[in-house]
Curated annotation (Swiss-Prot):
This is ATP-dependent protease ATPase subunit HslU. One of its GO terms (cellular component) is HslUV protease complex. It is found in: Cytoplasm. HAMAP family: HslU. Belongs to the ClpX chaperone family. HslU subfamily. GO terms for molecular function: ATP binding; ATP hydrolysis activity; peptidase activity; proteasome-activating activity. Its main location: cytoplasm.
Length: 447
């Protein structure tokens, strides 16, 4: 679980997302409150439930990116899911309980990796011993007294020399034969609606059939060391303990990001006739968000303290079009702003992995030095903003289209210009994009 303060969380988000201070603050406080709650003593701790967040804003302004970056900072089980994937119980499709099942799978994987890291050092030593046993088989005891001791000393000295060479990577390309446990063959079973639990049990039963079998393989020592380290680390783990910790982690720290929630509002489906009732999906979400118990293959999981963050563009609908009960489950509402020309300019250059840095790195692999002048950056931002205003507003995603079109010729012929420098200034931008950006009909199709 993350112990970062709200200011530190916002500072980290600022490295990747421009603007949207209100949304960043709301998310940072919600994440910090998870830690604060853990410091409160029972029974009051059980009464403190997370305050779910509804992010409202046009497409391409950073809603999904905030969630994606939050996942890395949270150090907690996190799942991002589109609300449109689900159907009302009784219809063909996924039911909302599968959100929790997917989240617990993520938590088990995360917990297993955490526990394996704790024992990795010891597992690596044991893996090295197994490889050294293959390279230097133990000599059979021959003779008595001093001779046997002398042989043992020699063997230990040789073993230490080989261990040193192994750790320095000098033996990486040498091949060895190993008996490696085969992973159990996965079996995909189509689940009828409402029978996901039975399907999981059948899948688990079949997956255990092939487990424990060993296969003899010839691999390089570098790969062998990794395989054996994973095998030894897995032996040290207690599976029941991992499952218990994973369930506890989901219940106390889990975060669910529900994207496109505006697409399941009733207004969007007025007059839709035979379409599956989206209002039914909202009603199915209610108990999950409010707090219920979901049966999974790892045991019962309570959702009372899972944090839900929902987001939507709400172009054709309003938050008030959600059913009242669901509206009440998202007490914190944050509106994200549309992007200005200055925001576009900052997105191009100010973030840690900005588009400009990405394209410079890509073309540097062909020994082409790409430079962006300040006036070139400004002109790019103005064109992206202008096209958004004239056609559909897709936010920062417009920059991908604009810069890809701008660098199309450079990218295509980069191999012929090795060692050269290409400067992108306002004139270059106008020459490449001017006609397309000014012609509204053309920009609809090209940009």
């Amino acid at each position: 679980m993350s112990t970062m303060t709200p200011a530190e969380i916002v500072s980290e988000l600022d490295k990747h997302i421009i603007g949207q201070a209100k949304a960043k603050k709301a998310v940072a406080v919600a994440l910090r409150n998870r830690w604060r709650r853990q410091q409160v003593a029972d029974p009051l701790r059980q009464e403190i439930t997370p305050k779910n967040i509804l992010m409202i804003g046009p497409t391409g302004v950073g809603k999904t990116e905030i969630a994606r970056r939050l996942a890395k900072l949270a150090d907690a089980p996190f799942i991002k899911i589109e609300a449109t994937k689900f159907t009302e119980v009784g219809y063909v499709g996924r039911d909302v309980d599968s959100i929790v099942r997917d989240l617990i799978e993520i938590s088990v994987k995360q917990t297993r990796e955490t526990e394996m890291r704790k024992v990795r050092s010891k597992a690596t030593d044991q893996a090295e011993d197994r490889i050294l046993d293959i390279l230097l088989p133990q000599p059979r005891a021959v003779g008595f007294g001093g001779n046997a001791e002398h042989a043992n000393d020699d063997n230990n000295a040789t073993r230490q020399t080989f261990r040193k060479r192994l750790r320095e990577g000098q033996l990486d390309d040498k091949e060895v034969e190993l008996d490696i446990e085969q992973p159990s063959a996965g079996m995909d079973i189509m689940a009828p609606p409402g029978m996901e639990e039975m399907t999981e049990q059948i899948r688990s039963m079949f997956s255990n059939l092939g487990s424990g079998k060993k296969q003899r393989r010839k691999v390089k020592i570098k790969e062998a060391l990794k395989l054996l380290t994973d095998e030894e680390a897995a032996k040290m783990l207690n599976d029941e303990e991992v499952k218990t910790k994973a369930v506890q982690n989901v219940e106390q720290n889990g975060i669910v990001f529900l994207d496109e929630i505006d697409k399941i509002t009733s207004r969007n489906n007025e007059g839709s006739g035979g379409e599956v009732s989206r209002q039914g999906v909202q009603r199915d979400l209610l108990p999950l968000v409010e707090g219920t118990t979901v049966n999974t293959k790892y045991g019962m999981v309570k959702t009372d303290h899972i944090l839900f963050i929902a987001s939507g563009a709400f172009h054709l609908a309003k938050p008030s079009d959600l059913i009242p009960e669901l509206q009440g489950r998202f007490p914190i509402r944050v509106e994200l702003d549309s992007l200005s020309v200055n925001d576009f300019e900052a997105i191009l250059v100010a973030t840690d992995a900005s588009l400009v840095k990405q394209y410079q790195a890509l073309l540097a692999t062909e020994d082409v030095q790409l430079e962006f002048a300040d006036d070139g950056i400004r002109r790019l931002a103005e064109i992206a903003y202008s096209v958004n205003e004239k056609t559909e507003n897709i936010g920062a995603r417009r920059l991908y289209t604009v810069i890809e079109k701008l660098l199309e010729e450079v990218s295509f012929s980069a191999g012929n210009h090795a060692g050269e420098r290409v400067t992108i200034d306002a004139k270059y931008v106008d020459r490449a994009l001017g006609e397309v950006s000014q012609d509204e009909d053309l920009s609809r199709y090209v940009l």
